[in-house]
Structure formats: C-alpha cells, structure tokens
From Swiss-Prot:
Keyword tRNA-binding: no
Transmembrane segments: none
Enzyme type, top EC level: transferase
Pathway note: Amino-acid biosynthesis; glycine biosynthesis; glycine from glyoxylate: step 1/1
Disruption phenotype: Alanine:glyoxylate aminotransferase activity is reduced by 98% relative to wild-type.
Organism: Saccharomyces cerevisiae (strain ATCC 204508 / S288c) (Baker's yeast)
A Pfam family: Aminotran_5
Subunit structure: Homodimer.
Protein name as it appears in the record: Alanine--glyoxylate aminotransferase 1
Coiled-coil segments on the chain, per record: none
Length: 385
C-alpha cells in the first residue's frame, strides 16, 4: 500500500518536478564514463547560464557533493590564504544565515565587520555599506541575497555599484542559496566574484549539491599560491577542483573525489527545465506567486510580514509572517498534510512562520499547493478566534 506524502512547503528542500524525481531513479554510472562525462559537461555549462555568466567571461563553475553551507567554506578557505594580503571582510547581514557566514569566515581567521539593517525585516541601507567601505579596507564584501530566516531580499545591483565606486579591488561575494532560480541574478553584469547556491531550493533538484561560480578575477587570486600562499582546506581547495571541473567541461573524465552521479543527473534535468522555460519567465512566475500569496496573507488575513511588504526588500521564493501561535498553526497544517516551517531568527524565532514557494509550487499554476496552504492558514487562525 502506498503511503500518502505530505505537501512540503518549507523554504527548501522543495517539491521536485516529475522529470527531476525520475532522474534520480537511474542505474549508477562510472564517474569517468563517457555517459556521465557528457551529463556533467552539460551541468557545468548550464550552471554558468543559470547564474547569467557568459563562457567568454572565463568564470569557473564548481558542483560538489555537499550542502549550501559548504559554499561558505569553499570561499573562506580559498580567500583566507596563508599569505592573504587582506583578510578583512564586511558582512552585510539581514538575518541568521548572514551571521552564520560571518562565523564561518571567522573560523578561518578573517577579521569580520558586520553591518545590519535598522530594523529586522529590512535590508541594510546602502549608505551604511558605503560608509563602511569608505572607512576601512576590505578584501571582500559578503551579501546574503535572500536570508531565509527573514525573507529579506538585498539589492545586489545597488551594492555592486557601491563597491565598484568606493572599493573596486574588493571581492563581491554572494550567498545565493535561496535566490538562484527565483530572483533576478546577473553574475557578470553585477560584477560578482564568488556566488554560492545549493541544489534543493529554487533550482529544483534534490538536496546534496553545493554549487558555486567564481569570476576569473577571484580564480586568479585563489590559484596564485606563490603570491597568496597555501589553502587552509583539502576537499574545499579550488586548486584541487579546478582541473577536475575544467576537464569535465571539456568532455574529459577526471578524478579527485567521487561525484554523486544520481544527484548530478537530476540537477541536469532541473537546469534544463529552468533554461527551457526561460530565466526571465521563471523570475516573473515566482514574483507573481509571491505577490499573490503575500497579498492574501497581509491584506486578506491582516497578518504582518517579517520582511517589509510591499517593498523591494521582500523575497519571492518564500514568505515569513507573524502569527499569534506558530506551533499551533504549523501543527494544524501538518494534520492536513501540509508542512511549513517555524521561525529561526534569534530575536523573533518563536513569533513567526515561513512558507516556501519555489520551483513547481510557484511556476505551475495548475497545481493547488499555495491556494490550499493559504486556505489552511486561514482556517488555523479562525480556530483561535
């Protein structure tokens, strides 16, 4: 007998499309076989395309076994080199995951300054970032494009311009775990030097892959051992992984550590789905679903959004709203087969709920996931009156 499966509407992992789910159910392939090399070659090329980077820019994609968090370690270990000329990092924090990135950087020896918004649920004012850049010399600025703890969306284009005008030598680093695939993202145009994401959110693949893209400028820095010294890491070393990725993209098998072949096969299908639909259309679909869902909760049910809504500070792949009794609402939805998430921000965690709307739940309007979720939240709140 088949057991019914709950509708998963947390901010990742997300519900997979039928084709992506099916791509997991394939026999194991040799990781240097012609069949797998062809798949991985396409994945690397399409990864660059989804980040909006041209091959001519000589940006380098990396797809490794691991979670999105591994991306922090990859950047930190290849930036904080033994002879790194500038270990100062400005972290633009809009929530829990921004702060965790800062903790990761400190663990490698970075000198970290953190700039925060005036109020939880808002983005950091651009003038505060510019002021910090004017006062201090930073080797890198990190921005969490969408902080999943608050559903705050940062304006990468504006921050990029501020860095270029105030401190052009500073690396621009973006945690795009909850934005690639659902938010406008322009790696080349915005001058991003290092961007990291994961497979299980808006990309629409299973959890288990850490996906990064490095600019040629950052690659020149990270690979220069004679000038900048050795890497404080082994698995995370770009010096070890770069020839592997270059060979796979050139259609040649290579080996450093065994890649998860089934996960990469499913990522291949997920990336093709995104590109076949079109990035701009996909961004629009996420925006439309997000606006409808937030408007229904904020204006329809008179709930307060954690991220300011309506505004350009509110993410399109998830919604965070304050409710009187989050555990009760979460339990009620669970009893009806819908799984949502609670809050995790250290200051407001017990006060709000989070709902993900990425991938098929946002892009396929024939599926009733979000309408059902809204109806259940409405019922849960009416029960408490």
């Amino acid at each position: 007998m088949t057991k019914s499966v709950d509708t998963l509407l947390i901010p990742g992992p997300i519900i997979l499309s039928g084709a992506v789910q099916k791509a997991l159910d394939v026999p194991s392939l040799g990781h240097t076989s012609p069949e797998f090399v062809s798949i991985f070659q396409r994945v690397l090329k399409n990864t660059r395309a989804v980040f909006k980077s041209a091959a001519a820019s000589k940006s380098q994609p990396f797809v490794l076994a691991g979670s999105g968090t591994l991306g922090w370690d990859i950047f930190a270990s290849n930036f904080i080199l033994s002879k790194a000329p500038n270990k100062n990092v400005l972290v633009v924090s809009t929530g829990t995951f921004s702060d965790r990135f800062a903790d990761c950087l400190r663990s490698y020896g970075a000198q970290v300054d953190v700039v925060r918004p005036l109020k939880i649920g808002e983005s950091v004012p651009l003038e505060l970032i510019t002021e910090k850049l004017s006062q201090n010399s930073y080797g890198a600025v990190t921005v969490t494009h969408v902080d999943t703890s608050t559903a705050v969306l940062s304006d990468l284009k504006a921050i990029s311009q501020a860095i270029k005008q105030t401190s052009p030598e500073t690396f621009f680093v973006v945690d795009a775990v909850c934005s690639i695939g659902c938010e406008e993202f322009e790696f080349d145009e915005w001058g991003v030097d290092f961007a990291l994401t994961a497979s299980q959110k808006a990309i629409g693949a299973p959890a288990g892959l850490s996906i990064s893209l490095c600019s040629s400028r950052f690659m020149d820095y990270a690979l220069n051992d004679s000038k900048n010294g050795h890497v404080h890491g082994y698995f995370s070393s770009l010096r070890r992984w770069t020839p592997i990725m270059e060979n796979y993209e050139a259609g040649k098998g290579a080996y450093f550590a065994t890649p998860p072949v089934q996960l990469i096969n499913s990522l291949d299908v997920a990336l093709k789905e995104i590109l076949e639909e079109g990035l701009h259309k996909r961004w629009d679909l996420h925006r439309e679903m997000s606006d409808w869902f937030k408007d229904s909760l904020v204006n329809g049910l008179q709930l307060t959004s954690v991220s300011r809504y309506p505004s350009n500070m509110s993410a399109h792949g998830l919604t965070a709203v304050y409710v009187a009794d989050p555990p009760d609402v979460i339990a009620f939805l669970k009893s009806h087969g819908v799984v949502i998430a609670g809050g995790i921000h250290k200051d407001i965690g017990p006060k709000y709920i989070r709902i993900g709307h990425m991938g098929v739940t946002a892009c396929n309007k024939n599926l009733p996931y979000m309408k059902n979720c809204f109806d259940l939240i409405k019922l849960a709140l009416q029960r408490k009156k």
